[in-house]
Regions:
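Amphipathic alpha-helical extensions and coiled-coil-like segments
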Residues: 153, 157-275, 279
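Short, charged/polar connector segments at secondary-structure boundaries
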Residues: 1-85, 91-105, 267, 284
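Glutamine-centric residue-chemistry signal
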Residues: 11, 46-48, 102, 125, ...
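Amphipathic, charge-rich alpha-helical segments that serve as recognition/docking helices
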Residues: 26, 35, 70-168, 192
Length: 290
């Protein structure tokens, strides 16, 4: 008992002995919030202790305080206050998520993997999970796992499940969601596409210079479920004129294919078209100058 009390008190731990939590779903980035944290630690030091658990090799795995540790190292501190607390993997994962979801700005990908990590940890602890559709397991807790997560974070269980769907997106598309190039609702529908179809979708997005709306994403999902979503289908759907985008010029893939060798990819076709348009523009400018 005395050993547990000794471990749970605040200790000064060298930064060199701290390691990030494995599978940490949150990024440590140099944004405005990090700048404020760094400035505060530079002036006042680390006021709120980190929480870490001891490892077998004598180091300490950070559970809460990755950003504080990063900022402390950036300003030249060699040690930081840490509450050392032994805990199993499931408890650690839940604490990692709960301590980070309170941050100001959280990317969709961060929230998605955080919810997934917490749901899996709760499942391992014996909570019932309803993430698998069509499940027939007996409910062993008063609330479903996703409902418990949502209640803690102030969102519905359906919102939790939809965020977790985003973890099925390939990294390139998930990055577009984080950058607000693809909206959340279409992204959820796109998560049902197979990985190879998502890679084709990247080509279609690059070729048409358009991203799918919710209705377009739902159609792509339906095509995938009905036997496969081809690149040509994707290009044709994305090339459609959307509401609020009526001045955009769009072409169907078959209208362009006849002008190019069969081996040409959408990217190659796009490069040729832009090159020809550039030449045409220069010719018009020369004609006007005469």
């Amino acid at each position: 008992m005395n050993d547990e009390k000794q471990m749970d008190r605040v200790q000064k731990i060298p930064i060199t002995k701290l390691i990030p939590f494995k599978d940490h779903p949150f990024r440590v980035v140099e944004d405005e919030s990090m700048l404020r944290t760094t400035e505060s630690i530079s002036m006042f030091g680390v006021l709120t202790p980190l929480i870490a658990r001891p490892t077998e090799d004598g180091k300490f795995e950070i559970i809460s305080g990755h950003r504080r540790a990063h900022a402390a190292e950036a300003v030249g501190l060699t040690e930081v206050p840490v509450i050392v607390r032994p805990m199993d993997d499931d408890v650690a994962k839940i604490l990692v998520v709960d301590s980070n979801l309170q941050r100001e700005n959280i990317l969709p990908s961060e929230r998605a993997f955080a919810y997934k990590m917490k749901a899996e940890a709760m499942k391992h602890q014996g909570e019932r999970t309803d993430l698998q559709q069509g499940g027939t397991s007996v409910q062993v807790a008063p609330k479903l796992t996703t409902a418990l997560i949502g209640e803690k974070d102030g969102v519905s269980k359906d919102t939790v499940k939809r965020f977790i769907r985003l973890t099925n997106l390939i990294p390139e598309i998930l990055e577009m969601v984080d950058q607000n190039k693809i909206a959340f609702n279409p992204a959820v529908e796109l998560s049902y596409l197979k990985p190879e179809e998502q890679k084709k979708l990247l080509e279609a997005i690059d070729f048409t210079q358009a991203t799918p709306s919710v209705s377009q994403a739902m159609r792509l999902k339906k095509l995938s479920q009905e036997g496969g979503c081809k690149l040509e289908d994707m290009c044709e759907i994305l090339a459609e004129v959307k509401k609020g985008d009526l001045e955009r010029v769009a072409f169907k893939s078959e209208q362009l294919r006849k002008y190019f060798p069969k081996s040409y990819t959408p990217r190659q076709m796009s490069d040729v078209i832009l090159k020809l348009l550039d030449q045409w523009q220069k010719k018009r400018q020369r004609d006007k100058a005469r």
